Amino acid sequence: MAKVLVLSGGLSEKEKSYSSQMLDLFVKTYKEVHPNDELEFVDLNTTKHAEVFLSRNTFATYWKDVESDKWIDKLKAADKVILSCSMTNFGPTAVVKNFIDSVAVANKTFSYKYSKKGDAVGLLDHLRVMIVTTQGAPKDWYLWGSHTNWLIGTWKFLGAKYVDTFELNGTKLSVFADKKPYDVVEEFRQDALEKAKQF
């Protein structure tokens, strides 16, 4: 039985949110494939990540105030992480960026002291990560602004041994204009099932 930490980082209300609907679909199919796994659900919008942000003014107390150690412990206790995030101004949502700020901590989730070549060594090397992302533009439309690639690189930096994505791109295109997010997402059920089997 695997322990799975499910992190929702969407910005919109659930019914209108492609990322929330994609997350729900992936989790539903994941449970079908892995019925004995234990899932813990967290909406990052209901945590300190929606209240306390890293800045010069908060630097001295940020990691304590945002409960960094609590979240790092959750990552260390989990076998898998499923994280959902929509693109916001060419990057991840603020709560997802803030979550990464709170857990990317030297000598806790990565370290340079074990490196032989000067590069960082990720300490979360037990984790398998599924990144569920959405964006209005087509895939790779903004090569300089891919929240998906940023998240892939970040989790690999932190040492995750497996990182995959379940993506919905182009939600602002005319092909989706007359459809509700739920109906659009349902078209990806088979993809979700295949991803869940591999994860």
UniProtKB/Swiss-Prot annotation:
Cofactor note: Binds 1 FMN per subunit.
One Pfam short name: Flavodoxin_2
Enzyme type, top EC level: oxidoreductase
Reaction catalysed by this enzyme: 2 a quinone + NADH + H(+) = 2 a 1,4-benzosemiquinone + NAD(+); N,N-dimethyl-1,4-phenylenediamine + anthranilate + 2 NAD(+) = 2-(4-dimethylaminophenyl)diazenylbenzoate + 2 NADH + 2 H(+)
Annotated S-S bridges: none
EC number, UniProt record: 1.6.5.-, 1.7.1.17
Protein residues bound to FMN: 17-19
Cofactors, names only: FMN
Swiss-Prot/TrEMBL keywords: Flavoprotein, FMN, NAD, Oxidoreductase
GO molecular function: electron transfer activity; FMN binding; oxidoreductase activity, acting on NAD(P)H as acceptor; oxidoreductase activity, acting on NAD(P)H, quinone or similar compound as acceptor
Residues making up the signal peptide according to the UniProt record: none
Family the entry assigns: Belongs to the azoreductase type 1 family.
HAMAP family noted in UniProt: Azoreductase_type1
Subunit structure: Homodimer.
Protein function: Quinone reductase that provides resistance to thiol-specific stress caused by electrophilic quinones. Also exhibits azoreductase activity. Catalyzes the reductive cleavage of the azo bond in aromatic azo compounds to the corresponding amines.
Protein name per the record: FMN-dependent NADH:quinone oxidoreductase
Taxonomic path: Bacteria, Bacillati, Mycoplasmatota, Mycoplasmoidales, Metamycoplasmataceae
Gene: azoR
